Each structure stands twice: as C-alpha cells, then as structure tokens.
Curated annotation (Swiss-Prot):
<dbReference type="InterPro" id="IPR036872">
    <property type="entry name" value="CH_dom_sf"/>
</dbReference>
<dbReference type="GO" id="GO:0007015">
    <property type="term" value="P:actin filament organization"/>
</dbReference>
<feature type="compositionally biased region" description="Polar residues">
    <location>
        <begin position="176"/>
        <end position="188"/>
    </location>
</feature>
<feature type="region of interest" description="Disordered">
    <location>
        <begin position="176"/>
        <end position="199"/>
    </location>
</feature>
<keyword id="KW-0597">Phosphoprotein</keyword>
<dbReference type="Pfam" id="PF00402">
    <property type="entry name" value="Calponin"/>
</dbReference>
<dbReference type="GO" id="GO:0051015">
    <property type="term" value="F:actin filament binding"/>
</dbReference>
<dbReference type="GO" id="GO:0015629">
    <property type="term" value="C:actin cytoskeleton"/>
</dbReference>
<dbReference type="InterPro" id="IPR001715">
    <property type="entry name" value="CH_dom"/>
</dbReference>
<dbReference type="InterPro" id="IPR003096">
    <property type="entry name" value="SM22_calponin"/>
</dbReference>
<comment type="similarity">
    <text>Belongs to the calponin family.</text>
</comment>
<feature type="modified residue" description="Phosphoserine">
    <location>
        <position position="163"/>
    </location>
</feature>
<dbReference type="Pfam" id="PF00307">
    <property type="entry name" value="CH"/>
</dbReference>
<feature type="repeat" description="Calponin-like">
    <location>
        <begin position="174"/>
        <end position="199"/>
    </location>
</feature>
<dbReference type="InterPro" id="IPR000557">
    <property type="entry name" value="Calponin_repeat"/>
</dbReference>
<dbReference type="InterPro" id="IPR050606">
    <property type="entry name" value="Calponin-like"/>
</dbReference>
<feature type="domain" description="Calponin-homology (CH)">
    <location>
        <begin position="24"/>
        <end position="136"/>
    </location>
</feature>
Length: 199
C-alpha cells in the first residue's frame, strides 16, 4: 500500500475480511488467460497477491488486454504508455475501466482504481477480470482467445412467441385445484390475539 500505515481495530478486521476473498487459484487462471489473450511478449508474474498487483499496477497489461478484445484498428486505447510516473499509471488503469464498461462489463463489477493501485481489494480486481472474460465469451465475436469454459457465459434473451390459437388452448386447461375442497385451506385458523384452545 502506497503511503498508507497499518490499519487497527475495526478497520483491520474489515481489511482482513476483504483479503480473505482473494482466490489464488483464480489468480493463476486469470494470468494464463491474460497472457494467452494478449498474444504478446508479456512476462508471467510469480504467484501471489503482491506480485499479481505489481504486474497489473502500471496499467499496461490491462490496456493490452482490453485492446486485444477488439478487432485490429478498433482498439479503445490507442496509446499505451509504459511510464513509471504514478499519475500516468493510474490514468491508464482508469482508461481500462472506462473501456471495460463500454465493452459491456456492468458498473457494479468494476473495481476502483485505488483497489488495484494501493492493493486494498485485489478480489475486486479479480471480479472485474472475471466479468470481462464472461462478456468476451458471451459476445463470441472471434476476438476472445482462450478456453471458453474458463468463464461463465452470460444469459441472453430468448423470446418465445405464441399464436392466438395456442393462447386460446391455454385458457381451456383446468387448474388442478379448481372445484376441489381438499388441500390447503384456512380451516382451523384462529384470529390474532385469541388464545390456543388446548384440551
């Protein structure tokens, strides 16, 4: 965490709960996908939360990832800077987040820049990358590289059309309880405030 002291008390408890949500197996899967998706000479980071954060922190890997999900010539981030200046790196992270939202990732699935930059919530970073992968698999536009089973396919609209005749036939169906006096009823129910009669 940059320029931030340790947290104490309830802040520490909250931070520990957030850190418990981080998934090391998911990290490996995401790293493999990012390297395969970008198809560039991207170095594989050592395992661990701190290394994963450092690998993504400058924003270049994230920008290359979002650009690789678009056809050539339509990349949303035309210039990727490899600057070591903090504000340039944070700007690249925010460019990635805007491009991910434009791509189709829901706002609720997008992490805050400080979650990655300060390492506050790396689980949120993982959730964003998972959501991005799910949208890419669902779009199925030929730009996704990787195993389709790595991410969940989002549900898509499947409208059904019924003819007038089918709707009329549905009105002729008799419900199973129509005309029956058996099954669930309110017989034996007492009103509120009345004592139970035990004999």
């Amino acid at each position: 965490m940059a320029n931030r002291g340790p947290s104490y008390g309830s802040s520490r408890e909250v931070q520990e709960k957030i850190e418990q949500k981080y998934d090391a197996d998911l990290e490996n899967k995401l790293v493999d996908w990012i390297i395969l998706q970008c198809a560039e000479d991207i170095e594989h980071p050592p395992p661990g939360r701190a290394h994963f954060q450092k690998w993504l922190m400058d924003g270049t890997v994230l920008c290359k990832l979002i650009n690789s999900l678009y056809p050539p010539g339509q990349e949303p981030i035309p210039k990727i800077s490899e600057s070591k200046m903090a504000f340039k790196q944070m700007e690249q992270i925010s460019q990635f987040l805007k491009a991910a939202e434009t791509y189709g990732v829901r706002t609720t699935d997008i992490f805050q820049t400080v979650d990655l930059w300060e390492g506050k919530d790396m689980a949120a970073v993982q959730r964003t990358l998972m959501a991005l992968g799910s949208v890419a698999v669902t779009k199925d536009d030929g730009c996704y590289r990787g195993e389709p089973s790595w991410f969940h396919r989002k549900a898509q609209q499947n409208r059904r059309g019924f003819s007038e005749e089918q709707l009329r036939q549905g009105q002729n169906v008799i419900g199973l309880q129509m005309g029956s006096n058996k099954g669930a009823s309110q017989a034996g129910m007492t009103g509120y405030g009345m004592p139970r009669q035990i004999m």
